[in-house]
Amino acid sequence: MQVLPPGSTGGPSRLFILRPVATTLLMAAILLAGIIGYRFLPVAALPEVDYPTIQVVTLYPGASPDVMTSAVTAPLERQFGQMSGLKQMSSQSSGGASVVTLQFQLTLPLDVAEQEVQAAINADTNLLPSDLPNPPIYSKVNPADPPIMTLAVTSNAMPMTQVEDMVETRVAQKISQVSGVGLVTLAGGQRPAVRVKLNAQAIAALGLTSETVRTAITGANVNSAKGSLDGPERAVTLSANDQMQSADEYRKLIIAYQNGAPVRLGDVATVEQGAENSWLGAWANQAPAIVMNVQRQPGANIIATADSIRQMLPQLTESLPKSVKVTVLSDRTTNIRASVRDTQFELMLAIALVVMIIYLFLRNIPATIIPGVAVPLSLIGTFAVMVFLDFSINNLTLMALTIATGFVVDDAIVVIENISRYIEKGEKPLAAALKGAGEIGFTIISLTFSLIAVLIPLLFMGDIVGRLFREFAVTLAVAILISAVVSLTLTPMMCARMLSQQSLRKQNRFSRACERMFDRVIASYGRGLAKVLNHPWLTLSVAFATLLLSVMLWIVIPKGFFPVQDNGIIQGTLQAPQSSSYASMAQRQRQVAERILQDPAVQSLTTFVGVDGANPTLNSARLQINLKPLDARDDRVQQVISRLQTAVATIPGVALYLQPTQDLTIDTQVSRTQYQFTLQATTLDALSHWVPKLQNALQSLPQLSEVSSDWQDRGLAAWVNVDRDSASRLGISMADVDNALYNAFGQRLISTIYTQANQYRVVLEHNTASTPGLAALETIRLTSRDGGTVPLSAIARIEQRFAPLSINHLDQFPVTTFSFNVPEGYSLGDAVQAILDTEKTLALPADITTQFQGSTLAFQAALGSTVWLIVAAVVAMYIVLGVLYESFIHPITILSTLPTAGVGALLALIIAGSELDIIAIIGIILLIGIVKKNAIMMINFALAAEREQGMSPRDAIFQACLLRFRPILMTTLAALLGALPLMLSTGVGAELRRPLGIAMVGGLLVSQVLTLFTTPVIYLLFDRLSLYVKSRFPRHKEEA
């Protein structure tokens, strides 16, 4: 077998060495394509990996959670459950609101999912309540995805109802039209309306009921077609004063006559301009506000979307009165841009460090310029390919390019070092370039394809993690491939034109000192290697111990999913007792806001109270805390969270749950804390039995903190127990009872006011100021068969009970979600294992199922596939090396270096206090590709020496180790310095980059020392083994 091509021909590099102009123009084309491509690449935090997600919201004011579940959510779920491509369906039914979240398979286009959802809603129309104020509204948005931008609209001169009306018609609609915007929500609920507050005593004294008033109002305010008159010469359109537009007009409405005298609405009710829902409120830095949350569509370019919004904001705000102020409270793209800038700086620093190492070893400016050109050319050329693949400039692709800095320079170094060796021996530069490039060409190809083989398994990772790292793997592979092309074309051509004996031998004092140092190091290495080769079994024992240590460290190291990022935004949930009213929650949020705004790291705060589809219950409030930029505060987000929770802990009757927002959102619902675990049953009764038991057990685990659940079954409910026989005798139906209660206490939307710009509601309710609580039920009167009025108490008893505040479903079955954080000193892997052990201890029945959700579920899937991923990388590399070497043995020798990389990486992570997460695992897989380079360079030269010079295997491997020591050391240090800026990263997004750098630097440091000694010993071991096999099983040639 001929491993290396003839050294004097130049191999694949010959044509490019002899045609410098063509080579230069080809490289210039690659450079130009990359520069143009860079300008077209979008900027993002991470690759787009969102599941196609659609949220369907139905509002039914006054309906209880039970009614919302049975009348609205269940019919919708049955229709949605028939859709193809649906991955998961979750729903939350609370007082007056139903929210169904549909998550589809990654392969299903969002537009197709949208059509399916619209068709399902249309098919379900006849099954939904006839008096729904509005049909179900769907939006292409993941509710768990934090808004890309939050704006607060305030005014010190106008009521919030007018402010919301202007914002909705002049601002929100325009922002909704921006490409990439999925949903614009107005938190604060101050939509203008005419509110009619009935005086129960007044209408009772007149013998009227709330139903009489409702009928009168709906009949007096209509907006329908009236036709037209078409005469011989003229056509006349018919119109009438059938609409009432203001509270004044409604106040004057005659609703009945008593003894011939008119009874006007103002006589029995307070009629005023107000808000459609008086139990909603939002505050920005404690000031009443309308808060606009802008959410993107799954898959949309967040940077482009935010830029478009900012460009149109000045024009939109000009259309508002001067007393209305629009403030951008948060913009996620600010941190995304800062993170990308920091990563770009680290990329530039890595290039500078790599070039510095090259100069330190070569000590020659022309020799340093050559790889100094090859590195940026390989990286810039990658941008052209990224454009065609629809990639983006994001943290992962920039990390890939930063790591590639150390990879791509390796090829150039190997070529330059080999050509320089021949020039120093007296060869002419052109002949040396042809001979050196031809001799090293196969090594370059081996290094390239074996390294790309390591990345192949990343391309086949499933689900969202696979999508996430596909851009990383492909970007790195493309950079490596372009580097190999550059190293076999441009690099030897430049060596032939720029290097000479004079330039290489020209030395100053620094050069001579470095040369003496390297000579001493190589001599020391030679003496050490000779001793190691004389004691092979001791070296093999060290190699075997390294393998065992790798396995042990893999078992004991804390495991996580994805680094927790500091993006400068904290999401919060404020929880109060289940019987809390809107007024008490508004008071509590004011107390909490005051404490939060006192923290020096907090820049702004928005809070929201009320049920609107996004916030499920009245006893909870949502918060968004925007921190100052990272360079303007002393603490990271986790320290700020701890400090805020301590500050709020002294406020009685509230629990505050906080979590930092993340760029990677896998969940489908807003959770109180970072991780979720669900308990599902076939009935609510089964859930109510097991939820307290499991929650108590989880709260006792030291591996979990801030454990809570969304199970709330202790809300106060007034049960109206109607005596049906008595009601029937009086001619009162259950529909009459429901209507009376709804008219009084449901903020019932009974009529619509149409204007040229918008539509507004008329809201009917009882004025309960003088009769609060259950006493208000005593004022309800119903119309009997004889036309008289009957108090509700005549046919019903009122009982106070407990009832759920919300009912949650997962795939149509009742479910409870437990939320938890992981305390310091424990990992997500520890928490997951503790929960699984608790499940076994409790011995849950067969009809109770549990499942991790969101990032915890993704962690389980990723952890289960990690070992197979590494095995697949090793197998892929073995296959490629076996094909290249036409040998079963030599690839094993090369792969024997891998355990050293694992030991170094795992030890470095443990010392640094980092978890073994997905980012660190990618670093270990990349180490597999880097570390085997040392063995490839040694073995290639040893095989050549055996074949061409007739040397013994021991002498050949000894000479190869000494000859390749300098390029091995140079390439390893280049790769190490390429990863060093990531390890030392401190800026925005550093949490994401640091584990990769730590794993690679640690792995390279340990493997560099060990592989220089273990590889030659293992090479000789397998050589002896090969000879033994050949002697025992000789191959007999058949004669023709």
Swiss-Prot record:
Gene Ontology CC entries for this record: plasma membrane
Q: Which UniProt keywords apply?
A: Cell inner membrane, Cell membrane, Membrane, Transmembrane, Transmembrane helix, Transport
Q: State the oligomer form and interacting partners.
A: Part of a tripartite efflux system composed of MdtA, MdtB and MdtC. MdtB forms a heteromultimer with MdtC.
Q: What is its subcellular localisation?
A: Cell inner membrane
- Which HAMAP family does the record associate with it? MdtB
Major place of localization? membrane
Q: What sections of the protein cross the membrane?
A: 25-45, 347-367, 369-389, 396-416, 440-460, 472-492, 537-557, 863-883, 888-908, 910-930, 968-988, 998-1018
- The protein here is known as Multidrug resistance protein MdtB
Q: What InterPro entries does its record include?
A: AcrB_DN_DC_subdom, Acrflvin-R, Multidrug-R_MdtB
Family, per entry = Belongs to the resistance-nodulation-cell division (RND) (TC 2.A.6) family. MdtB subfamily.
- GO molecular function list: xenobiotic transmembrane transporter activity
Q: Does the keyword Cell cycle apply?
A: no
Q: Which domain of life is it from?
A: Bacteria
Q: Which organism is it from?
A: Salmonella gallinarum (strain 287/91 / NCTC 13346)
How does it sit in the bilayer? Answer: Multi-pass membrane protein
